[in-house]
Regions:
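Solvent-exposed loop/turn segments at secondary-structure junctions
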Residues: 156-158, 178-180, 238-242
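Alpha-helical structural elements of signaling/regulatory helical domains
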Residues: 226-227, 246
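Active-site cleft segment of glycoside hydrolase catalytic domains centered on the general acid/base Glu
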Residues: 201-211, 237-259
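Aromatic- and acidic-residue-enriched carbohydrate-binding clefts of CAZyme catalytic domains
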Residues: 115-120, 128, 175-222, 226, ...
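Short Asp/Glu-rich motifs
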Residues: 124, 161-162, 183-185, 244
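Secreted/periplasmic carbohydrate-active enzymes, especially glycoside hydrolases
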Residues: 1-172, 217, 232-233, 249-253, ...
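A general secondary-structure junction signal
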Residues: 235-238, 272
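Catalytic-site neighborhoods of secreted/periplasmic enzymes
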Residues: 181-184, 268-273
Length: 273
């Protein structure tokens, strides 16, 4: 893989709806100091542009991204030296807002009811191997049954699934690979037999290293998926032990980190039964 010596490393966007239009705040990260330009295109028609590594793109009569009515704009970043293009990066963005307010999920300021599944990335054809035809079939089946949302149980999926969710207008609760954080009954009894002392899952000597690895996995997921319009929330854990004395001390740094890393400040959650 050949890369320019000076190149685009990352970018992030946030959206605001303003008087029938939209404002897109952006930040571009590069490994150099040359000029950066950003364009938003509706198909091949330029609808907004700005210069600099940070800025705001103003789009009049913006076409919003919505459930089963997805609309994606082309997003182009260029690093230039005079008239010479040093690097060029293309992506697609959907303009939408998502928040929790007064007990409601609001998509573009309007209530939306989440209907769907805790999904798994597998099939009878490829197992967990990526098969785009199978992925497309799954989206069509979910639409047929009336779903609009799924949780990536229990790990981030292949990026192509998020790209297709952006295109199909599906909502994703993106889950970090943190599952099984619970003492089994037999292990709990064996670990505490005869001493009368209860040791919860998050009071073990391995917990600091576990938390370090958990933070790294969470960082990787949010860094990769933060610009997908389909991603509306971060799931921090799946069915963890919640009665351990160390539960809050373990959970809180993760929830705080997710809020810090995400420019769009999506809701944070975890799955529990």
């Amino acid at each position: 893989l050949a890369l320019p010596k000076e190149r685009v490393l990352d970018f992030e966007v946030t959206h605001r709806l303003v008087d029938g239009g939209a404002e897109v705040d952006y930040t571009v990260t590069t490994n150099g100091s040359h000029d950066v330009t950003v364009e938003v295109l509706d198909g091949t028609t330029k609808v907004a542009e700005a210069s600099g590594k940070t800025g705001t793109l103003k789009i009049t009569n913006a076409k919003l991204w919505n459930v089963h009515a997805a609309y994606l704009y082309n997003f182009v970043i260029r690093i230039t030296d005079g008239h010479a293009v040093i690097d060029e990066y293309f992506d697609k963005i959907g303009i939408r807002t998502f928040e929790v307010k007064d007990g409601h999920f609001l998509l573009n300021g309007k209530p939306v009811y989440l209907r769907g599944f805790g999904k798994h990335e597998d099939s009878d054809i490829r197992g967990r191997g990526l098969d785009l035809a199978t992925v497309k079939r799954d989206y069509e089946l979910m639409k047929w049954i009336g779903a609009n949302c799924f949780r990536t149980s229990h790990y981030p999926y292949a990026e192509e699934l998020y790209q297709m969710a952006d295109e199909e207008g599906f909502l994703i609760i993106d889950e970090v690979p943190a599952v099984g954080f619970m003492q089994s009954t037999m292990n709990f009894l064996a670990a505490n037999q005869g001493n009368g002392k209860k040791v919860g899952y998050f009071e073990k000597e391995t917990t600091p290293k576990l938390l370090e690895n958990h933070k790294a996995a969470l960082t990787d997921m949010i860094t990769r998926d933060k610009n997908h319009a389909s991603v509306i929330a971060w799931s921090i854990l799946n069915e963890p032990q919640c009665t351990s004395e160390g539960t809050e001390a373990y959970f809180k740094p993760l929830f705080d980190l997710a809020h810090e890393l995400d420019p769009q400040k999506r809701p944070r959650t975890y799955a529990i039964v």
